[in-house]
Regions:
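Bacterial N-terminal signal peptides that target proteins for export
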Residues: 4-23
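Hydrophobic core segments of beta-strands in well-ordered, beta-rich domains
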Residues: 64, 114-116, 166-186, 208-211, ...
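Surface loop/turn signatures of beta-propeller and other carbohydrate-active proteins
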Residues: 41-48, 83-103, 131-168, 187-190, ...
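Beta-rich accessory regions
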Residues: 39-81, 104-123, 143, 346-348, ...
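Beta-propeller domains
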Residues: 74, 80, 151, 158, ...
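Structural motif
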Residues: 73-74, 125, 190-194, 251-257, ...
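Beta-propeller blade signature
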Residues: 196-200, 255-262, 310-312, 367-378, ...
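Bacterial N-terminal signal peptides
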Residues: 22-33
Length: 591
């Protein structure tokens, strides 16, 4: 769906940083209202929970009023006696929390029938014909995406509106980073899984491109990956972008789509599904070119293990092996895998890193990313650690579904994660949108006491965000803390005038770093949100890098030995930093 032109996320995020823009924003909202109008409609109640709404849209968008506390309703859009779209939506019964756009541009000035079936568990007991939704529904030429959320990050990717979770299908091509993501364009809670799409030239400033892969007869569109087919092995064109995703219908099967316009639009393969299994949780295909095998590999989650396949043409896949039954954490569902070859720091050796996202089962509850290091010959992955060893990529509560970009320049492995947790992702205190991605991170490997671990370093593109050095924290800042002279425990506190604070502690003797967000701001939206998270530092920390944004604090050891990501929701941004004596501090405002 294209909204206005391609809207720049950075523009809408930064309006309220410039007070003089306020008048312009108000004028813009007034102009937008002038382009919307109420919709004449006929409402026919077939039962207490079944309504037919007849209307003739005169403009592109039908704005659906949403009430988040209501139950889902199944909505079918019918044109010329054909169902052209099916979605689940929480239509407003009593009040409107926000509206979402239903694109009816192809059917302007044609009769459209909305067949709406409300679930029996709906909260409202009133007559469905009297729902607020029918009175508040509007037709509009444009959908206003001006930011209305105080907690929208200033330099993290977010959807303009709606719900987002897993990053999907990420690749780099012709100077552009492509990020697809699990997306609900019809509400700010999980539902209607679709692939949203954003692009960037610098991994920081993102442009929303629409929804190129939408649900179909095989089901909604769950997570997956994309590759650049440089040799036309699939027969879909040299340098075609080939996407793989899980079709989630009555069962979970794997499907393929290809793009000849650099991922802006996709054509689904007539032979879908390309891979099936009887396992209920069979999803999230990650495909990559294996130069050692001279073939393609695919890894996906199949219950409590990862299945590995190979192919010469991206369409016909041969099962090779399975990994994981006796390894790592099995307290939740395994999903969203990735598998890559990485150099080991300080050696001429390379090893394979297998990412396995798990929910629940994280070290502090809910979802998290565990990983395994070993060898892979294109057929079988062999983990070098003992089966009961569990390693975590990030020791915060809010780092999940981590995957990497295909075809990244300079053989880099750049990762993004969903910056939230399934324990409370649907309840965080925003409505226009929910969820952001982590900052981009480059991955590597290092050895500590005979074990190989993943190194996680903020991507170099973030350096371009640095503005002026400032004396105190801002709503968007990077804080560097030199810890080389610290032999005693070091406490770092971010706080504001409301006595809200995030307290971090580095224990050099124990080699641990912790973050306490129990008094960080709004926490009562979930019993699972208050937390103290603790990470091993694998030796002495030399420099701590903190990335602070409107709703997050991400902590890194400058050498990549430690990463911790936590959401926070202060009433006002933290503007005070207190650090134990002896630690040198530099703060950059991020522009």
């Amino acid at each position: 769906m294209q909204v206005h032109a391609k809207m720049k996320l950075t523009w809408v995020r930064r309006q309220f940083r410039h007070p003089r823009m306020l008048c312009l924003l108000i004028c813009w909202m007034m102009i937008t209202q002038a382009f919307s109008q109420s919709v004449p409609m006929k409402i026919s109640a077939l039962s207490d929970n079944h309504v037919l709404v007849s209307l003739t849209p005169e403009q592109r968008y039908l704005l659906l009023p949403i009430e988040e506390d209501e139950a889902q309703a199944a909505l079918k859009v019918i044109v010329d006696n054909e169902v052209v779209e099916t979605l689940n939506v929480k239509l407003a019964a009593d009040h409107v929390d926000y509206s979402v756009p239903l694109d009816l541009g192809r059917y302007t000035n044609k009769p459209v029938l909305l067949d709406v079936t409300f679930h029996n568990e709906r909260r409202s007991t009133g007559d469905v014909k009297d729902f607020t939704a029918w009175k508040a529904m509007q037709s509009a030429a444009h959908f206003d995406t001006t930011n209305r959320e105080k907690y929208r990050p200033l330099y993290h990717h977010t959807p303009l509106w709606g719900w987002m979770n897993d990053p999907n299908g990420m690749f780099y091509k012709d100077g552009v980073w492509h990020l697809y993501f699990q997306y609900n364009p019809y509400g700010s809670q999980w539902e209607n899984m679709t692939w949203g799409h954003s692009t960037s030239k610098d991994l920081v400033h993102w442009t929303f491109e629409g929804c190129p892969i939408r649900p179909d007869g095989l089901g909604t569109i769950f997570s997956g990956s994309a590759v650049v087919d440089k040799t036309n092995s699939a027969g879909m064109g040299k340098d075609a972008v080939v996407a793989f995703y899980t079709s989630a219908g009555t069962s979970q099967v794997q499907s393929l789509a290809h793009s000849s316009d650099n991922g802006m639009s996709f054509t689904k393969y007539d032979g879908n599904p390309i891979l099936t299994d009887k396992v209920p949780d069979f999803r999230d295909p990650k495909v990559f070119w294996n130069a050692d095998l001279n073939a393609w590999n695919l890894i996906l989650a199949a219950g409590q293990q990862m299945n590995i396949y190979s192919s010469k043409d991206l369409k016909n896949w041969t099962f090779e092996s399975a990994f994981g039954r006796e390894y790592g954490n099995h307290d939740g569902v395994w999903e969203c895998p990735d598998l890559m070859k990485l150099p080991v720091e300080g050696t001429k050796e390379a090893k394979w890193l297998l990412l396995c996202n798990i929910n629940p089962g994280g070290p502090f509850g809910g979802s998290a990313t565990q990983y395994f290091v070993g060898s892979f010959d294109g057929h079988k992955f062999v983990c070098e650690s003992q089966p009961k060893v569990t390693k975590w990529m990030d020791y915060g509560k809010d780092h999940y579904a981590t995957v990497t970009f295909d075809n990244a320049p300079d053989n880099r492995r750049v990762a993004l994660a969903w910056m939230s947790n399934w324990q409370y992702g649907n309840q965080v205190p925003t409505q226009q949108f929910r969820s952001a991605n982590s900052v981009p991170r480059d991955l590597g490997l290092f050895v500590d006491q005979g074990e190989t671990y993943v190194s996680v370093t903020p991507s170099r593109e973030l350096l371009a965000l640095r503005g002026d050095k400032v004396s105190h924290p801002t709503a968007a800042c990077e804080i560097l803390i030199d810890l080389r002279s610290q032999a005693q425990p070091t406490t770092i506190t971010l706080s504001n005038a409301h006595h809200e604070q995030v307290v971090m502690t580095y224990q050099p003797k124990d080699h641990t770093f912790s973050m306490d967000r129990t008094a960080s701001g709004l926490t009562d939206f979930s019993n699972h949100f208050k937390a103290i998270t603790i990470a091993p530092t694998h030796g002495k920390l030399t420099q701590l890098r903190l990335f602070v944004d409107k709703c997050s604090v991400e902590a890194f050891d400058a050498s990549g030995r430690m990463a911790m990501t936590n959401l926070v929701f202060p009433k006002v941004p933290y503007d005070k930093l207190t650090v134990s004596k002896g630690a040198r501090v530099t703060i950059y405002d991020l522009k």
